[in-house]
Design a protein with these regions (language model features):
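Short, conserved, GDST-rich strand-edge loop motifs in beta-rich repeat architectures
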Residues: 137-146, 190-214, 257-274, 317-327, ...
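Post-signal peptide N-terminal segment of secreted/secretory-pathway proteins
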Residues: 55-159
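Entry beta-strands of beta-propeller and related beta-repeat scaffolds
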Residues: 38-45, 88-91, 133-135, 187-191, ...
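Intrinsically disordered, low-complexity segments enriched in Gly and acidic/Ser/Thr residues
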Residues: 288-377
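Beta-propeller blade signature
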Residues: 59-61, 105, 146-157, 204-225, ...
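Repeated scaffold domains used in trafficking and secretory/extracellular systems
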Residues: 75-87, 118-132, 170-182, 238-248, ...
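Beta-propeller fold detector
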Residues: 66-78, 111-121, 158-174, 226-235, ...
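Bacterial Sec-dependent N-terminal signal peptides
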Residues: 1-44
Length: 411
């Protein structure tokens, strides 16, 4: 098998998670939202400005349908590359050996402020929310084959559990299991993975991929974070990509859907299987062999990324050229209840810009706000209606060279 270089190295700083000990308390901590007071909310963005000396900011705005938002007299500067929102808090995560996590909320005036002590941890490659009060992070196992997980208490701002797993033993093939995402499914944690053998002495991303024509998911207990078993399928490729934090979602009826780009290693070797969506029925802990939604067959091209909207509908980016594994993308709505694809009108064809789609799904089950960069290098929010497949352009994120996250916080 040929040795390949992980094509995602350029974004390795993109999606990291952290945890650990302690740092400082902040007197501006706004605390949880008082349930007696009227609930107000603002949208928050994380973006990096343009220029060599540009910083990264968390900024807020009341309205994403028009106008512009920037860091001018707005928001806070952060030294982080990835972010997870839990318990009405934005956790800013640094991608380094110490891996500092800093919490941010909106205060009573609706301003973004640091909301408590910082927490140190290790370099993290996957993360995911569990319930309303916890999130889990996992380390980078590509060279070591050692999978470290931690459970982060988003209320008390502390680590509440850890585990270590030998990921080489999971595959039983001599290849390491490199997890590509972390998802809550029922009372378990599902971690999709691909098989990878690191080149001794090489960089962390240099090595040899295993089969590109199969799907694997490691099932872990919760809250113990102990490996239990692997479930697999052979109708598409592996789920997710390194540090993309997408590829699987449990929907309202308890069924879980997972999608594969089936793009191979992104450089030399391609998957022989189509890009599509598979299903795990509620409580089954195995793939449903009666269900396969062939997205590549329906659109003529492979999935790039996807995110759940609601009511069985997913927003998906697919490449514009058949067989492509990079470049221009267009947006579709994938209805997994009816195996139907609806093109999204109003969002221009554009370059795929990173590890995941930058989105925030509203609670109405049909609206998703998507951040994209246009051909002029400017970032806008597009407000997409999943029922009609239409989109309108909204707020301009001014001065942005990259946007990492969009969410909504109450205050």
């Amino acid at each position: 098998m040929k040795k390949t270089t992980n094509f995602l190295i350029t974004g390795i700083l993109g999606m990291s998670v952290l945890l650990g000990a302690c740092s400082k308390n902040n007197s501006e901590n706004p605390g949880p939202v008082d349930p007696v007071k009227p609930v107000r909310s603002k949208y928050v963005f994380v973006y990096t400005g343009k220029g060599e000396a540009a910083a990264t900011y968390i900024v807020s705005t009341d309205d994403i349908t028009k106008g512009g938002v920037s860091s001018v007299n707005n928001g806070v500067e952060v030294d982080a590359w990835s972010f997870i929102v839990q318990n009405n808090t934005v956790f800013a995560q640094a991608y380094n050996e110490q891996g500092l996590v800093r919490p941010f909320r909106l205060n009573e005036q609706g301003k973004v402020v640091e909301a408590g002590r910082s927490v140190t941890t290790f370099r993290t490659g996957v993360s995911g929310k569990v319930g309303k009060d916890f999130w889990i992070g996992g380390g980078d196992p590509r060279s070591s084959g050692i999978g470290e997980l931690y459970r982060f208490d988003a209320v008390n701002l502390q680590i509440s559990g850890r585990s270590t797993t030998d990921l080489n033993k999971i595959t039983g093939t001599g290849f390491n299991a490199v997890w590509t995402g972390l998802f809550e499914v029922g009372n378990k944690i599902y971690l999709p993975y691909y098989k990878f053998k690191h080149t001794p002495g090489g960089r962390v991303y240099e090595g040899e991929y295993g089969s590109l024509d199969s799907t694997w998911v490691a099932v872990f207990s919760y809250p113990e974070l102990k490996y239990e078993k692997t479930i697999g399928d052979d109708r598409t490729g592996f789920i997710g990509d390194w540090s993309s934090q997408q590829g699987m979602h449990q929907i309202e009826n308890g069924d879980t859907y997972a999608w594969s780009t089936a793009m191979g290693d992104g450089e030399h070797r391609k998957s022989a299987k189509p890009s599509g969506i598979v299903r795990i029925k509620k409580g089954a802990e195995q793939f449903d062999k009666s269900y396969f939604f062939n997205i590549e067959g329906a659109t003529g091209s492979k999935i790039s990324r996807g995110e759940y909207i609601g009511n069985g509908k997913f927003l998906m980016a697919v490449y514009t050229n058949a067989g492509a594994t990079g470049g221009k993308i267009k947006m579709i709505i994938a209805d997994v209840f009816n195996n139907k694809v609806t093109p999204v009108t109003g969002v221009p064809v554009h370059e795929f810009g990173g590890f995941k789609l930058i989105v925030y799904a509203e609670q109405d089950g049909k609206t998703i706000n998507y951040v994209m960069q246009d051909d002029a290098g400017e970032y806008y929010v597009y407000i997409i209606n999943a029922d009609s497949g239409t989109a309108t352009r909204g707020v301009h994120i001014e001065g942005a060279d990259g946007v990492t996250a969009i969410s909504k916080l109450n205050y």
